[in-house]
Amino acid sequence: SEALPVKNNEPLIISIKKDGAIFLETESTKDRSLSLEEMKNFVSKIFEASPGLQVVIRGDGEVKYERVMTVMAELQIAGASDIGLISQPISSQ
């Protein structure tokens, strides 16, 4: 299985869009939405190659809290222990 490239010392970024779609920001996955299971499998492979890597969840300001918590739980199952959050502002519409 190929290791997914993550630049040295840079966190792995997981984006959660307003509709709950999950994107893993690596070269091979950044342009397609992933299921929770796909995300967990990709992240597990990344952690095999880079244990201890920081993960940052970039969530849309309007994404449901429950969705963020579900993604965090799956990341922990995949081996992530250092998980941070970045929120994107809620649109002014």
Question: What function would you assign to each model-found segment?
Answer:
Residues 1, 9, 41-44, 70:
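A generic local structural motif
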Residues 1-31, 51, 82-93:
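Extracytoplasmic juxtamembrane/flexible linker immediately downstream
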Residues 47-63:
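Short, surface-exposed beta-strand segments enriched in small/polar/acidic residues
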